[in-house]
Regions:
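Internal, well-folded beta-alpha domain core
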Residues: 109-200
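A generic structural motif
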Residues: 34-47, 177-185, 200-202
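Long, compositionally biased intrinsically disordered terminal regions
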Residues: 176, 187-188, 192, 207-262
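N-terminal ordered "arm"
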Residues: 2-57
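Acidic, Ser/Thr-rich peripheral helices and adjacent loops at domain boundaries
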Residues: 53-57, 194-208
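Charged, alpha-helical interface segments at or near domain boundaries
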Residues: 39-134
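Short, hydrophobic/amphipathic alpha-helical patches that form generic packing surfaces
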Residues: 18-29, 98-102, 166-170, 220-228
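Short coil/turn segments at secondary-structure boundaries
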Residues: 79-84, 182, 235-242
Length: 262
């Protein structure tokens, strides 16, 4: 009878909570891991031999999965899963699901089994997200607006805004600041002395260049002039520059605004 079972594709929301809820449903359904796949929405291509089920986000269920990962595997496993879940990848749901099947059965020792594709895949996704997050700790640029709020526009391959918000809450705890993911229409807002808040705001479109404080505008111009004046023409190496500072980050870095030859 097993060979006649239809494949179940669990379509999850493209978020950490969404994927964790998919994992919860897969483990509690008892349908069989061999007959289930996790896919990240909003759209999944099925076939004549598969049934697609939409997984609703449930914070309580997601929390149970997090607790199980930490207690039955390790905190490191949760770190890897969390990072991987924010990757720009259509395969991340299935990779996380297959990894957790192995890890719940074998414990934390599976984390070092790099010869297993599911383990290697999880590490690769997590490493890619972590690397971009580390880059943006240095590449993200805040600018002072006329209302004394520090504003930063974010462009990233992976969904790393939350990790940046946590970092800058520690670094700038007594500042009012906003991190705006301009491509995903997401905003992280921090009031001085408080925890950051997250909102999804598709209408958050106003160009902050029109609201820069006078001192910020002057500093931006001085900074551009400085970076241009210290550059040595004979030592320009655009290829190396793009390796050290990928071009996708240039758009919202003041020192790169309208610089000639870039």
């Amino acid at each position: 009878m097993e060979q006649n079972k239809r494949m179940h594709i669990l379509m999850c929301q493209n978020s950490t909570e969404g994927i964790l809820c998919g994992v919860y449903e897969a483990f509690t359904s008892r349908y069989g891991h061999a007959w289930q796949k996790l896919a990240v929405g909003p759209y999944v291509n099925g076939d004549l031999f598969s049934d697609i089920y939409s997984v609703e986000v449930n914070t309580e269920k997601a929390g149970k999965v997090v607790k199980a990962i930490i207690s039955k595997i390790s905190e490191e496993a949760w770190y890897l899963v969390h990072m991987a879940s924010e990757a720009d990848s259509q395969e991340k749901g299935e990779i996380i699901y297959r990894f957790l099947i192995l890890a719940f059965a074998n414990g934390r020792k599976v984390l070092n089994a790099m010869s297993i594709p599911e383990v290697m895949g999880l590490h690769q996704l997590s490493r890619s997200v972590s690397r971009e997050t580390q880059h943006l700790y240095g590449f993200l640029r805040f600018q002072e607006l006329q209302n004394d709020i520090l504003y930063a526009r974010l462009v990233s391959k992976h969904h790393v805004g939350m990790f940046l918000a946590e970092h800058f809450q520690d670094r700038l705890p007594m500042e009012n600041w906003v991190i705006h993911d301009v491509e995903r229409d997401e905003v992280w807002i921090h009031r001085a002395g408080e925890d950051w808040l997250y909102i999804r705001h598709p209408d958050f479109r106003q160009d902050p260049q029109m609201m820069l404080s006078s001192s910020e505008y002057a500093f931006t111009e001085w900074w551009k002039t400085f970076t241009e004046s210290v550059a040595i023409l004979e030592r320009r190496n655009p290829k190396l520059q793009m390796q050290m500072l990928p071009k996708r980050y240039w758009k919202y870095m003041p020192e790169m605004f309208t610089n000639p030859g870039r």
